[in-house]
Amino acid sequence: MLKTELRKAKALKKTQIKNEGERTMVKKATAPAPTNEVGNLIRKQREAMHMTVTQLAGLVGVSRNTITNYEAGKTEPNSSDLVHISGALGCSINDLLHGGIASIPPRFAFRAHAPLRKDQAITVVARKYLRAYDEIEEIMNSRLSGTLLTFNTDQEGPLKDEFIKMAADTLRKSSGLHDSGPENIASVLEGLGVRTLFFEHDGKGIEGLSTIQGDMKFVMLRNRRKEGKLIERTIFSAAHELGHLVLHPQLFTSEDLDEEKDSKRHEAEADKFAGNFLVPEDELVRVWVEERLSKHKLFDALILLKRVFHVSFHCLYRRVTELHLHHSLDRAIFVNQIKERLGINGPATMDQLEPDPLPPDALYTTNRFSRLVRSASLQDLIGVSKVAEMFQVTVNRAKEITTDWVTPKIGPIEA
């Protein structure tokens, strides 16, 4: 079947001779070069994913020259080669050769996610999840309702604080965050029209990422609950990525971008959006005044606020100082105060500098995608191998997952 697909792809682009009357008289020296449709398609997908030839070769497990020769039409990939290449690009062979909605590479905010340029494996994982999400919605005939609001502004350069606050407040009011709580941030984003799921990642620099494919808005969050690490960072990352989707649609492009242009500003604006979204001004000021938190030392006041808003200590510090409820402290002095209260000597990570961390199990990682896959499996609409493909796990792991679905856990039985 793959050989047939290759023949179809090669036939997509035929050479046309300008002078129809001299079709049989064309000189050999001026004959058009052989078409290279498959190589062009590989190159197009690679460039759209912002991969270098070397990066793609590394993911496929071949030499750089092999990929170069494929793209130049000097050699032709066989069926097995295409399986590995399409997998490395995060698409199916059919998508690679014939196009369609699923073949359109997702658009990442590369300027806002600099580590993506170095770790292309993450973008491939994201693309596979996007394709799986689109497929399971089609199988279940269940499309995510609601469309994420965007806010247009004519201003050039940095966004005004008032504009960022307005956007965050508007979305917060329609999100149900107040009732659901930030621990259920995945459900909150899905309620706003953003497909959300969790991924596992051992590297540094990526806590979450946002991407767009067609009309689909998508956020992937690092599964810190499974790692037993600070989930406050996951919550803030989710709101931060929402900020990029809402405030910076121009970042999500497949075109070449300036490496560092305005990246710090965009990150600062997304951080400001996240702070306003998670800790709204009116509610923060009300609690601060009603509970007379100004009477406390800053450390104790922030601990009390954390019991209200369930976000990170440092997010609350930024909000309190932004709103001039307390004066800003020199970072070194503030960190030393935290260390003193926590009994920490020597260097410390940001996770270690978080007083009273939320328990990892408090984060709800169940999401719409996993529920749809489970529902399809229980209805025998998909098999174990498809579950493995969609979850990007081994077949043996998928068997364990589907077995657990059939035999749910029960609570303790009283004697």
What are these language model-derived features?
Residues 2-415:
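Active-site hotspot residues in diverse enzymes, especially metal/ion-binding acidic/histidine motifs
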